[in-house]
Amino acid sequence: MKLPIYLDYSATTPVDPRVAQKMADCLLVDGNFGNPASRSHVFGWKAEEAVENGRRQVAELINADPREIVWTSGATESDNLAIKGVAHFYQSKGKHIITSKIEHKAVLDTARQLEREGFEVTYLEPGEDGIVTPAQVEAVLRDDTILVSLMHVNNEVGSINDIAAIGELTRSRGVLFHVDAAQSAGKVEIDLQKLKVDLMSFSAHKAYGPKGIGALYVSRKPRVRLEAIIHGGGHERGMRSGTLPTHQIVGMGEAFAIAKQEMAAENQRIKALSDRFFKQVSDLEELYVNGSQTARVPHNLNLSFNYVEGESLLMSLKDIAVSSGSACTSASLEPSYVLRALGRNDELAHSSIRFSFGRFTTEEEVDYAAQKVCEAVNKLRELSPLWDMYKDGVDISKIEWAAH
């Protein structure tokens, strides 16, 4: 077993070797390096063929028409294009948008920008399981609502929204529905022939493809119109200009093709690993699972270890790569906005760690990580006066701390 161990697959995944090989064939002078927009010679034609093959592979994973796939630089751009594109195109119909408080920043910051432009945004608060219900959406739909934007799988806690039911609701009311599927593609089955979803964002690097490439599904029936946010040579039917990066697209296509073949078996393997890890740490006292216990992807396990600082635990796990629910790493001491929205208090939010498992995780790594977590939590609690007080039966929430 090699150290350090990577258990942060929700942040990014390594590129699958099969994907890297396909990408390498599109870079050098004796490879498929042409510009897909070059219409007058074989180098361009070959590149265009590779791009269209990648488009078909992405469409096949989600059961869409390849013509509904628009290439972007990643899920952040896809979210921006979907939300701003709809808002600007349909603003004469209304200026009200619905989203939730636990979306990715790519959605939340885009919504904030639209608020500055005069749009009105309703931010729904999920239940403590991290799920937004169709009833919640229905309660805030208005005649001037033009878009609902909700994630499929939450990136911090792994809970799965019922996008099928929400889609039925939005379609019946004539409201467009955008879904951020960055964390669900390749993990949860997506069938866009059945789902009433108008726009869906995808990322390659969350599914063993390269960084810097993503896609936006834009429904043709019913047809969705977007106003472009990047202008130029009119690539991607004018929705997203810029020379297409053949090697990236080939990589994303291959990654999605592999996901389609291996998803069912891989999900079972990951669930076994996640259960194995949880079983070994579940003897720890004051351990809380964040997010839904049932509607969740097995790849993500977000745990709060009460009376332990998330940052201290991260530092103690020096040869295990995980991420903390509190964003101290990004120079702020604010606890995770997602966990706060789920109703977790600051202490539990600050003591959370996200473990995420993936294609190259082994049983040996999981066992090692679980052992190290138990050792670190017990050691840190031994040093904690709050833990001593809790063990002595003192209700810490009732203590009035003196200001200093």
Swiss-Prot record:
One of its GO terms (biological process) is [2Fe-2S] cluster assembly. The active site is at residue 328. Its cofactor is pyridoxal 5'-phosphate. One of its GO terms (molecular function) is metal ion binding. [2Fe-2S] cluster binds at residue 328. Pathway: Cofactor biosynthesis; iron-sulfur cluster biosynthesis. Pfam families: Aminotran_5 (PF00266). The keyword Transport does not apply. This is Cysteine desulfurase IscS. It comes from Pseudomonas putida (strain W619).
